Regions:
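C-terminal motif of bacterial Sec signal peptides marking the signal peptidase cleavage site
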Residues: 17-19
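Beta-propeller domain segments
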Residues: 22-66, 103-105, 122, 202, ...
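Surface loop/turn motifs at the tips and blade-to-blade linkers of beta-strand repeat domains
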Residues: 73-77, 143-149, 189-197, 250-254, ...
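Hydrophobic core register within WD40 beta-propeller blades
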Residues: 84, 155, 205, 258-261, ...
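Residue-level detector of Asp-centered blade-edge/turn motifs that repeat once per structural unit
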Residues: 87-90, 157-159, 207-211, 264-267, ...
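Conserved beta-propeller blade signature
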Residues: 91-93, 161-164, 171, 213-217, ...
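Asp-box/WD-like beta-propeller blade repeats and closely related beta-sheet repeat scaffolds
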Residues: 138-161, 166-208, 223
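Blade-level signature of beta-propeller repeat domains, shared across WD40, Kelch, NHL, RCC1
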Residues: 413-435
Length: 435
């Protein structure tokens, strides 16, 4: 049996016995971030639990809720719509992809309830195009834009090409504005690490505003490097490349699972959402939104929120830990904060202008469910966060005590009219939030 699969099943099925017997004593640490003071309890202050949600689906007529806004189905009957991209012409591209488990990993997922959260199963491995030509909030055209992919996530139209980030490579294809499908031959411009226990498979993609560079997110293969750091080469990073795939370098490192990418309005500063580590207790470690500095290190796997050392990592690098950045905006522990979109549109009230909207896919490693919502982080016109994250789109949880949910938000994107789209990969719906 493949050793990686053995470790993976153990991670899903086992309990953190080391942690239960080695809880650290002492009060929480208080850490100042850009938006608030966050309290970090000692590792294993609470047990590490596995509380997977149970997806029930959306009844007819039921929808998430955003106070003061209208929420309607933009598209339904998709197959795990994971990420969204709006083309310069206003077409919506939906990446349909899912976590794929095989063999013992699949068996273990069913045993512990992981499969009931609707994150696993055959991956559609395609991109669907939605076109609302008359701008009435209902797409009239729905076509297969590109298929035969390998867990696609990041999408980009840039300099005459359509780019897609599969889990194992970045490809580009000749693109004609307004095309409803890709017909030309693709070119693989960058291989990406995806072998073995590919714990974090999403790869996002974004162009610098000046068009000279592309940025690619690559999450870690593991929780805290437990399979060996030889399996983490080129992972837990945001990579920078030229548009033809050449010139690869690490732009920022120590990011366990960076997913959302965006340049804050009013600046050329790159921001990302990061899924932090699991199995240290209910309130460790908070996911976060942070700006990225060229060459900066953000802690993984050695530390979190600056120099807070992870006790499970035995071969520490204290000099590197001293350099670890404290992230800007805490987003709650185990919320699985994924999608990121900045609002520059005309529709939402002024207080939402410039701010960040973040899709929180929801927890599995917490006693009570966290996430399962879209949150909003206010930003100044100069591109700086000004207040903590607040709930924006809620109602995804059906019964918290029973861990039942209607769906799970992931990717977010704004249409040209200023309305917000939210991909719900468990509900197989794209929601539209408008005024």
């Amino acid at each position: 049996m493949n050793r990686m699969h053995v470790w993976g099943v153990a991670g899903l099925m086992g309990s953190v016995l080391w942690g239960c017997s080695h809880a650290e004593k002492g009060p929480p640490d208080r850490v100042e971030t850009r938006t608030e003071t966050v309290e970090l309890p000692r590792p294993y202050t609470t047990d590490s639990v596995r509380k997977f949600s149970k997806v029930r689906g959306w009844p007819e007529g039921k929808a998430p809720v955003a106070e003061g806004f209208t929420v309607k189905r933009y598209a339904a009957d998709l197959v795990s719509p994971r990420n969204l991209y709006v083309t310069p012409q206003g077409d919506v591209l939906v990446a349909e992809a899912n976590t794929e488990l095989r063999g013992m990993m699949k068996f273990g997922a069913k045993l512990v309830g992981y499969a009931a959260s609707a994150r696993t199963g055959p991956s559609a491995n395609r991109i669907t195009l939605l076109r609302d030509a008359d701008h009435d909030g209902v797409p009239e055209t729905r076509t297969v834009f590109l298929e035969g992919l390998n867990q696609p996530f990041g999408m980009l139209v840039h300099a005459g090409f359509f780019y897609v980030a599969n889990t194992d490579a970045v490809w580009r294809y000749p693109y004609s504005p307004g095309a409803t499908s890709i017909t030309g031959k693709g070119e693989k411009i960058l291989d990406l690490p995806a072998g073995g226990y590919n714990n974090h498979w999403t790869r996002n993609l974004l162009a610098h505003p000046d068009g000279t560079k592309l940025y690619v997110t690559v999450g870690s293969a593991s929780n805290v490097g437990e399979h060996g750091l030889d399996n983490e080469v080129r992972r837990a990073n945001v990579l920078e490349i030229n548009p033809d795939g050449s010139g690869e370098r690490i732009f920022a490192s120590g990011l366990r699972n960076p997913v959302g990418l965006g340049f804050a309005p009013g600046s050329r500063v790159l921001w990302t959402t990061v899924n932090e580590r699991d199995e240290l207790g209910d309130e460790l470690v908070p996911d976060y939104l942070t700006h990225l500095e060229d060459g900066a290190f953000y802690g993984w796997p050695y530390s979190y929120f600056g120099a807070h050392v992870d006790p499970r990592v035995k071969e520490q690098k204290p000099e590197l830990v001293k350099q670890a950045k404290v992230p800007d905006v805490p987003l709650g522990s185990h919320t699985a904060s994924l999608g990121l979109a900045f609002n520059e549109g005309p529709m939402f009230p002024e207080r939402f202008r410039h701010g960040a909207f973040i899709g929180q896919h929801g927890s599995w490693n917490r006693s009570k469910l966290s996430g399962y919502q879209v949150v909003f982080v206010p930003f100044s016109p100069e591109g700086q966060p000004t207040a903590p994250a607040e709930p924006f789109l809620t109602g995804f949880i059906q019964n918290a005590d029973e861990r039942e949910v209607y769906g799970r938000p992931v990717g977010v994107a704004f249409l040209p009219d200023g309305s917000l789209l939210v991909a719900d990969d468990a509900g197989n719906i794209v929601w539209r939030v408008s005024r």
